[in-house]
């Protein structure tokens, strides 16, 4: 153990000022942070059984969660399978001293320079464990902000941080299994929160999402799927509702920064990261039915206050209907309460039921049948694409 008495640090939490910086200033600050991490990580520790450490953290929490009946049978099977992969992904040789609580309330800023505070959780661990808190903060910055600074957090301001870390500290992100390792760390972290607050569905979803990421590499591939039910099973395991921003960062079940930073992902990208909005999911569902020879219809429904306000206050839902044995079905995955394959007497009755949930929002409502969803468009560009689509297929309802 070592101790150091330091003088009072001048400055403010980085959370207080991050939103005011230019991108050039942000890059310089992350470069300083990388230099500070390198200095801390230069203290090499002895190797120990990291896999066993994480297993011993996870299992008592998991048993407690099962005793609380938090997870259903299907979810337990997924978690059991993900746990069986800890040995595969957690083997480590690179043990260093880490800060272990790096978020912006523990980084002080003054006159262009940063200083780190609050080293009480420091430990020797694999180098990438430093990202456990830091990467989670990048994805959900408001979670680690104080009550005073939370109002300044906009996830769009954090999208380039990992790019700068890769540039100035590539060793920190060099593990080939980094994606799975960070997902395991998430499983442990969110499970610990969940057993304290079992009523919070968001925490449960975070644990399940981490397990799906760990299991993703070994599951059935999209090309193996042959029937609508197999497609639903595949998507239940491999696709969560979320989006990828224009820097490639993932956002699970939150829309902060969506309008500013969203780009429609390709099917391959959605499968790679396991996230998609109703737009990407409808794109993939239509692709599947086209490939399998099912007659199908792809729709985009929008409701908004006025024509002039279409890109500011709009609700949108993309969905697919398909025909099987002379009946029409709605294949819904992205809308969790409606998830499933639903049979209807006609296309019209399906549309009436699907769009009824949006009737209370906005005076202008449009339903447009489209034949494709281009990748790479912003939300506004996609809305324009749909609005300008073949007028003969557009319905106002």
Question: Language-model segments: which ranges?
Answer:
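Active-site catalytic-loop/activation-segment of kinase and kinase-like phosphoryl-transfer enzymes
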Residues: 4, 38-41, 49-89
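Secondary-structure boundary elements
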Residues: 213-272
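Active-site acidic catalytic loop and adjacent metal/ATP-binding pocket
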Residues: 2, 81-129
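A glycine-centered beta->alpha junction motif in the catalytic cores
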Residues: 6-23, 64, 184, 188-202
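Active-site rim recognition segments
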Residues: 323-396
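Hydrophobic/aromatic-rich core segments of domains that either
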Residues: 283-356
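Active-site activation/catalytic loop segments of kinase-like enzymes and analogous catalytic loops
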Residues: 129-173, 186-200
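ATP-binding pocket architecture of kinase catalytic cores
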Residues: 1-49
């Amino acid at each position: 153990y070592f101790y150091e008495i330091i003088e009072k640090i001048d400055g403010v939490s980085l959370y207080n000022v991050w939103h005011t910086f230019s991108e050039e200033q942000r890059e310089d600050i992350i470069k300083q942070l990388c230099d500070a991490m390198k200095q801390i990580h230069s203290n090499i520790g002895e190797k120990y059984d990291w896999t066993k450490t994480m297993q011993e953290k996870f299992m008592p929490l998991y048993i407690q969660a099962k005793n609380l009946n938090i997870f259903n049978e299907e979810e337990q099977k997924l978690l059991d399978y993900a746990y069986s992969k800890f040995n595969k992904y957690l083997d480590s040789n690179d043990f260093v001293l880490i800060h272990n609580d790096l978020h912006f309330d523990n980084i002080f800023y003054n006159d262009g320079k940063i200083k780190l505070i609050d080293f009480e959780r420091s430990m020797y661990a694999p180098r990438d464990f430093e990202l456990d808190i830091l990467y989670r903060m990048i994805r959900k910055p408001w979670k680690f902000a104080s009550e005073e600074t939370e109002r300044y957090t906009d996830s769009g301001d954090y999208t380039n941080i990992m790019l700068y870390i890769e540039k100035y500290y590539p060793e920190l992100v060099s593990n080939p299994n980094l994606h799975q390792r960070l997902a395991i760390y998430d499983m442990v972290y969110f499970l610990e929160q969940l057993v304290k607050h079992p009523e919070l569905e968001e925490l449960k979803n975070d644990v399940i999402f981490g397990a799906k990421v760990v299991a993703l590499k070994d599951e059935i591939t999209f090309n193996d799927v042959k029937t609508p039910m197999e497609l639903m099973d595949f998507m239940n395991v491999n696709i969560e509702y979320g989006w990828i921003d224009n820097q490639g960062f993932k956002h699970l079940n939150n829309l902060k920064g969506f309008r500013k930073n969203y780009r429609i992902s390709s099917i391959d990208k959605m499968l790679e990261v396991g996230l998609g909005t109703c737009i990407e999911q409808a794109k993939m569902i239509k692709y599947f039915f086209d490939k399998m020879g099912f007659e199908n219809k792809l729709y985009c429904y929008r409701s908004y206050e006025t024509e002039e306000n279409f890109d500011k206050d709009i609700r949108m839902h993309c969905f697919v209907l398909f025909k099987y044995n002379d009946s029409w079905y709605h294949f819904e995955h992205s809308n969790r309460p409606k998830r499933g394959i639903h049979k209807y007497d006609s296309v019209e009755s399906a549309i009436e039921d699907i769009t009824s949930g949006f009737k209370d929002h906005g005076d202008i409502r449009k339903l447009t049948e489209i034949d494709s969803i281009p990748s790479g468009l912003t939300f506004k560009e996609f809305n324009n694409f749909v609005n300008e689509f073949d007028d003969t297929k557009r319905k106002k309802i």
